[in-house]
């Protein structure tokens, strides 16, 4: 399933705990997806 937006945030550098992917809305930046918060 393709969403029309990055599920996390667009950045040139993601946090070490983030998953990352490429997304068209982020252009040349990464789409950083933070892990789900526990608690």
From Swiss-Prot:
Notes on temperature effects: Denaturation temperature (Td) is 101.2 degrees Celsius.
Gene Ontology cellular-component annotations: extracellular region
Q: Which UniProt keywords apply?
A: Disulfide bond, Pyrrolidone carboxylic acid, Secreted
**Highest taxon listed in the record's lineage:** Eukaryota
Where it sits in the cell: the answer is: Secreted
Gene3D superfamilies (alphabetical): Antimicrobial Peptide, Beta-defensin 2, Chain A
Where is the signal peptide, in residue numbers? none
Tell me which residues bear Pyrrolidone carboxylic acid: 1
The SS bond pairs are 6-32, 10-26, 14-31
For this chain, the family text in UniProt reads: Belongs to the transferrin family.
Protein name (record) = Small basic protein 1
Query: What organism does the record attribute this protein to?
Result: Anas platyrhynchos (Mallard)
